[in-house]
Structure formats: C-alpha cells, structure tokens
Amino acid sequence: MGKDYYQTLGLARGASDEEIKRAYRRQALRYHPDKNKEPGAEEKFKEIAEAYDVLSDPRKREIFDRYGEEGLKGSGPSGGSSGGTNGTSFSYTFHGDPHAMFAEFFGGRNPFDNFFGQRNGEEGMDIDDPFSGFPMGMGGFTNMNFGRSRPAQEPTRKKQDPPVTHDLRVSLEEIYSGCTKKMKISHKRLNPDGKSIRNEDKILTIEVKRGWKEGTKITFPKEGDQTSNNIPADIVFVLKDKPHNIFKRDGSDVIYPARISLREALCGCTVNVPTLDGRTIPVVFKDVIRPGMRRKVPGEGLPLPKTPEKRGDLIIEFEVIFPERIPQTSRTVLEQVLPI
C-alpha cells in the first residue's frame, strides 16, 4: 500500500490549503533534525516535505486523491494515464531538498541554529513549535536577525543543495544493446521576479551506453528545486541491474546456471546454452562435471564499457542434481564400477 500524505501531515482528506500549511509548519518544526535527535527523525522530516510538496500543488493533489501514491508516481491503473507519463518511466518523484523547503517556508536558511541559543530556557516556549509567536510563511523572519549582526549590504551566500539520487533500473538486454531512457521529473523553478516559484515538468534523456557497469552515475546539474535561497541540487541517476530470469551478471561476464543430472555429470552431456541475443550454443562435455564447476564460452558476455566492440565471457556454472533414492540393483552396479 502506498504512502498516505494526509496521514503524514495529520490531516483529513478535503483539508483546506491553510490547514495544509499549518500542518506542514507544525510537523516540520517537530521533526526538524536540528531539534529532534531521535532515530528516524531525518527520514520523517523528508516524508513531511514530500507530503507538503504534493498536497500544496493542486495538480499533484488531484492525481493523488484519485489514484494514490502509485498513480502519482506512474505505476497506477493500467487503463489510464494517472497523470500522463507519455511513455516515460515515471511521472512524479520528490526531487526537493527538505531543508531548502523548510527555509523557504520560514524565510531563513536554518533558523534553529541560533534561535535556540537566544531563547534557551525561556519560560512559556512551545517545545513543539518554537516559532508559534511569529507569522507563518516567508514574512515571518524577514526583519529578524538570528545570530551575529551582519552589515545590511552583505549578500547571503547561496549554497548548493546536496545531490538527489535515484536508481535507474535496466535489463541485461538493454546493457547488451544500449538504450535510451526518458525520465520525467517535476521541480520548482524561480520566476523572473526572483521571489515567486512555479512548478515545472521536464523530460531528462539518458543514453545508456553498451556495457555500462552497475553503479554508473548520470548527473543532471542543478535540476533540483530552485528557490531564492539556494542553488538547485544536481539530479543523479545510478545504474542498477534488473534481476534476470536466466542470467546473473559479474562485471562484463554473464553467468548461466546449468542444472544437470548426476548421470549427465558422470557420463558427459551436451548443454544448450542461451545467449543474450537470443541464440543457443550447444556445448559438449565429455569429462566428469563436479558440482559448482565453471566453464567459459569466450566472447558471449556483455560489451566491455571502454571497448564495446569486445565482449566478456558467458560462464556456465553447473548444479548437479542428485537422486533422492537409488534402487538396490543400481547401487550394486555403481559399487562395482565407481572408484573408491
């Protein structure tokens, strides 16, 4: 079952925009890592930011209300578009920095750092909401000085948000041939006035080269959320292999697990080995095959990343299936012919 963003913010469905803002304000202050040191607070803080990102956007909220998280992220009902992925791999993923969202909401990069130092021990302070005495939104802190005084003309130095990483799942066949992946993201962009923000969709195109290794990173600079206080994060996709129903990958080699009987292991056999491009190679074995033994078929693996015209090997890994019972007559024959 997918996430319930209303439950994350402690809201009922049908909550007003003002109720959503108040709920985000309350929960974000409660679980901010600078205040809440409990295990899991950082992850909860991120979940709260994602919930607010969806519910504060009318279009995302409408899709979520109709299809849930699965529909919002492109894996909803197969009969509909659930947001219109247009053939892309997903329609929505939270790419924002929860700390930047918090700063934008309250009008300061991280008010916790100095605020608690100034009000530490003050009576009547609301522990869950230390900013309860101030207005909500960008205007609440614009005329307040947190920490050491600073000349008015000194500009605030912007910092880039940390990279936002996502897995990019590809099949062995796609690594073998190379492929193109189109990933749809939704991020926030700063309007020309330098203050207001719009939501913007963008298609990121990834050319997966033949033979790329698992763990290869593809970076799209500054494609994360943009605010007046930050430099957008880089969006980074990390290549991950999809599980294959036949092969296992070992670098540029592929491993084919061959199951043979004890008789075949002792007397020899022919193994019909499939390849990634759909062919079948018959490989003859005349010697005794031991459990776990490996044999290479050279040049039938994946392309090498730096020299894709060359290929790794296809490795046959044997599993010998022993019989559960042997008739007495067969046992007698085996005792006579097998070496001690």
UniProtKB/Swiss-Prot annotation:
PROSITE patterns: DNAJ_1 (PS00636), DNAJ_2 (PS50076)
SMART domains reported for this sequence: DnaJ
Biased composition range(s): Gly residues: 73-86
Keyword annotations: Chaperone, Cytoplasm, Nucleus, Phosphoprotein, Stress response
Principal localisation: cytoplasm
InterPro entries listed in its UniProt record: DnaJ_C, DnaJ_domain, DnaJ_domain_CS, DnaJ_subfamily_B, HSP40/DnaJ_pept-bd, J_dom_sf
GO BP: cellular response to heat; chaperone cofactor-dependent protein refolding; negative regulation of inclusion body assembly; negative regulation of transcription by RNA polymerase II
Subcellular location: Cytoplasm; Nucleus; Nucleus, Nucleolus
Stretch list, region Disordered: 68-90
Domain J as annotated: residue spans: 2-70
Tagged with keyword Protein biosynthesis: no
Gene Ontology cellular component terms for the protein in this record: cytosol; nucleolus; nucleoplasm
Entry GO MF terms: ATPase activator activity; ATPase binding; Hsp70 protein binding; protein folding chaperone; transcription corepressor activity; transcription regulator inhibitor activity; unfolded protein binding
Positions bearing Phosphothreonine: 307
Superkingdom of origin: Eukaryota
Keyword Iron-sulfur found: no
Subunit-structure text: Interacts with DNAJC3. Interacts with HSF1 (via transactivation domain); this interaction results in the inhibition of heat shock- and HSF1-induced transcriptional activity during the attenuation and recovery phase period of the heat shock response. Interacts with BAG3.
Biological role: Interacts with HSP70 and can stimulate its ATPase activity. Stimulates the association between HSC70 and HIP. Negatively regulates heat shock-induced HSF1 transcriptional activity during the attenuation and recovery phase period of the heat shock response. Stimulates ATP hydrolysis and the folding of unfolded proteins mediated by HSPA1A/B (in vitro).
Protein name, entry field: DnaJ homolog subfamily B member 1
Species per Swiss-Prot/TrEMBL record: Bos taurus
Gene: DNAJB1
